[in-house]
Each structure stands twice: as structure tokens, then as C-alpha cells.
Amino acid sequence: MSETFAELFEKSLTETDLRPGALVKATVVEVRPDRVIVNAGLKSEGIIPASEFRNEEPHVGDEFFVVIEASDNGFGETRLSREKARRAKAWSELEKAYKAGEMVKGVIIERVKGGFTVDLNSVRAFLPGSLVDVKPVRDPGYLEDKEIDFKIIKMDQRRNNVVVSRRAVMEAETSAERQARLEELQEGQEIKGVIKNITDYGAFVDLGGVDGLLHITDMAWGRVKHPSDLLNVGDEVHVKVLKFDRDKKRVSLGMKQLADDPWAKIERRYPVNSRVFGKVTNITDYGCFVKLEEGVEGLVHTSELDWTNKNIHPSKVVQSGEEVEVMVLEIDEERRRISLGIKQCKRNPWQEFAEKHEKDEKITGKVRSITDFGMFIGLEGDIDGLVHLSDISWTESGEEAIRNYKKGDEVQAVILGIDPERERISLGIKQLEGDPFMEFVESYDKDAVIQAKVKEVESKQAVLELADQVLGQMRLADYTYDRVKDLTQELNVGDEVAVKIVNVDRKNRLINVSHKAVEGRSEKGTRTVSDVPTKTTLGDLLKEKIQSKDE
């Protein structure tokens, strides 16, 4: 079968597959002399030949996995195989043992040309005659029908081909050198060995009959791209035994453990905010690694390369092998990580700007970009200041006002705020001029009558121009004491109306006015216009306020 037992088992848990070859779980419902009847959750009962239950006696209620051979054998029965399921599981276990180099148990069941057939838990394997023992054996009959240990030396499940060796087992068990080495090996022991093989993840070291694994992470305290960068087959190395599993005869070795850990007390040698020199060892899309000393590297993240170019690729700032000055930003000794910065070794343009300029100062720059929330103005030091939509015009909405600008335009603005730590400069264009709304509000007399001009009129309200760039709102109820249902029947755009201010909403920049407040009532209830002098312009209001102060 091409699928492993683990794959078939997983599939049996997630889906119901009724095709021949599918693995399903079955429960014994009846045991007969020639067959075993099981319930496998199929349309009909399953039949398993009794011959497949060798060396075991099935009982009603027993559960096990079976393979579907035929969903209908012509008699309304489903033919199942316990043996094929057992073999699928056996193949999976043999594959694990083969990859791990572990021994397996089997029985020599017959002689064939050139060797023997070995039963490895329902899987047949070939044992070459030359691999039966460490020396030639004339009559190996004494080994037949006995469970003994073998080592798999070749395996191909698709071709149903397994080759085993008893000789390899005996050599491992009877090697005097190996036994002696195994007995003397201790964790923490320093020993010499020879590099036997190199892989992507490490190197195998011959310690004298015993092989140990020197993992790539235990070769050096620093970064190792590939074991072949440090070692060659045949090299004699000095290593330390890190871990020794006597039962599985596995040895883990280390080279870097022979030297002091460079990360120990590293904060004393590299205090945070200290500036040091290092060599660029690796460049990635997210930053560059800088070697501070043997076994100690730190990362300069892309955001810490340059003050103004946040998304610049590291390769445009540094080169591999280049010596650079860096500042230690953060140290995590436990995780063996150091965060470094290159830009911190240069003057901060945001801080320089803050030292040279003050709030409310006027500056000039060119529009670099326009966004949904405002526009960025280029300033000295290759930094930007933001003019928010709300700071472009006093009278127009930000969305309308920003249409008057395009990229490259030179504009003048007022500095509203400088925040070097957050790298932000707030600018305003409307602040170049006084706020007509606030100037009007601060100058008007509560009892003053204003001659306003109708700008817009609807049935329930009207918008009036109180002064240049200052508008007020008058509701229908504030127009007159008389019964009026529709302002459009009383007022036209351009009409002048005498009004008084009845409310000012500074937060929402809204002025409510009333014509009714200007009117008076006679004793008979007739309407009269108040004798309060009429002020027609903002200038008149300011002039009157100044005169009242002088008096």
C-alpha cells in the first residue's frame, strides 16, 4: 500500500471511505470456525477469514482496524482483511525504525536463493547470507523460527522491498571498543573525535565505536550558516558530551560549550544607550545583523536605520562586512537578543528642528504629498510637517480647501506643535490669518442690533451673513411674534434683517440670531421696532467697543 498506516488512520478518523483499500475500524459480532463476522459501519456485515487471526483468538466485542478488499463479494457480503491492516501498521513502524537506525525484531521463516526470508510482523524482508553473522555460517538452521534482532539497511515500500542485517546488530553489540566507550561516557565529559559525516543540521562525530551528534546550534556561540563552514569530514575535534541516553545509545555533543558564554553579564559590557562599533554580517529585508564580538550579534531593524526613510531597504544603507557605529537600544539576555540602532548615532532632525523653531512661528515649505486627512509640507532636515484638513481654512471645509493645493506648491504655514519623540510637527495655514468667527464673537455687544443679509432661506430657518465670513442661523420661531408658517414667504436672498445674537456655540462655531428679539410690543399688542441703534458691520462693533473702553 502506498499510504502509511498513520495516513490511513488519520483518514479513517476524518472521512468514511468505502473504496477497496480503505482503512476502517471494525467490531467483532460473531466468531465462526472459518471466518469472523465484524461490523465496520458498512451497508453489510464484513467477513474476515479465520486464517488471518494467527496466534490470536478473536472475541465478540474486539475492535481493530481492517482494510476493505471488496464491498460486495456477490453474496451481499463485504470482504475485509485484518492481515493487510496489520501489514500497513507494520510498514509504518518499520519505516520509523529505519529512519532512526533502531533495531527491529523478526523471525527467519525460510531459505531462499542468496539468503533467507524474515517475517517482520507480517512484512517479509530479505536477509542476505553474508549478513547473517560477523563470520561465515555453514548451517544457520539454529536461527530459524526464533525471534531475533535485525537492522534494516534498505527499504522501499512501493516495491515491497526490505533488506535486513543481523551482522550489523552483532557488530554493534560485540564491539569491545564500543562497549568500553559506552561505559566511560559521562555527561559533561570532554573528549576528542573525528568528523564522520556532515549534514544540513549538524555533524556526526566518531568517538571510537560510538557516534555522537554535534548539532549546528552547538558548534559556536555565533551564527553558523552551514556546518561545512566550520568543519570538514576527517577533522579531529574537541567536544563536550552534553547528553547521553544509555538506553538508546544516543550522544549529543557540543563545541561552543568548551568556551565561556559571551552572553553572560552582557549588559555590563554593552549598557543600553552606549555606542559601539561592529561589523555587518547579514542583510535581510527587515534589517541587518551586526557582530559586536565573537558569538554576539545584534539586529538593526529597518526602522532604526534612518530618521526619515522608514521603509528603506537595508542594502541601500549598509554593506555586508562594513564596520558601522551602532547604539544599544535593548538587551534580552535570556533570549540572547540585542536591538541596535544606526540612526541614533546621528543627529535627530526632529530634535534639531525643535531647537531651532518655536510654536506659532511662520515657516515656508513645499507640498510633498496630499492625503485624505491633510497634506505634508517638506521642511529642513528632510522631515515633514502635517497640515490637517481642519487647519487649512476658517471658512471652507477641509475637503474643499485642500483642492486648492497640489504637490510641489510652496506654502506658508504656522507651527502649531512640535513633538520630537513622536516625530511629529503640526502646521496650520488658516492660523496665518485671524479667526473671523472668534473676532466677531469677542467683539459683539450682547444688546447690539446687527443688520444682517439673507444668504439662504428655507421654510423653517434662514442663514444670515452677520459680518465678512461670519454666518448666523435664524429659526422660524425667532423671526417674529406674528404667526408665520414659512420663512420663504417673508424673506428673500439678499434682504437685510435687523437681528440680535441670542446664543453662541464656540465649540461647533455656531451663532443663533433672532429678529423677534429686536421687535417690541405695544400695550395693545402691536409690534414696534426697538430704538436700539443698528450696527451694520464688524468694524462698527469693534469701534464701539473701543470707544466704550475709552469712556
UniProtKB/Swiss-Prot annotation:
Domain S1 motif, chain residue ranges per copy: 21-83, 101-167, 188-256, 273-343, 360-430, 447-516
Any one Gene Ontology molecular-function term assigned to this protein's record: mRNA binding
Keywords: Repeat, Ribonucleoprotein, Ribosomal protein, RNA-binding
Pfam families (UniProt xref): S1 (PF00575)
GO cellular component: cytosolic small ribosomal subunit
SMART domains: S1
Example of a GO biological process term: translation
Keyword Zinc-finger: no
Domain of life where this protein originates: Bacteria
Matches recorded under InterPro entries: NA-bd_OB-fold, Ribos_protein_bS1-like, Ribosomal_bS1, Ribosomal_protein_S1-like, S1_domain
Family, per entry: Belongs to the bacterial ribosomal protein bS1 family.
Functional description taken from the UniProt entry: Binds mRNA; thus facilitating recognition of the initiation point. It is needed to translate mRNA with a short Shine-Dalgarno (SD) purine-rich sequence.
Record's protein name: Small ribosomal subunit protein bS1
Species lineage: Bacteria, Pseudomonadati, Pseudomonadota, Gammaproteobacteria, Legionellales
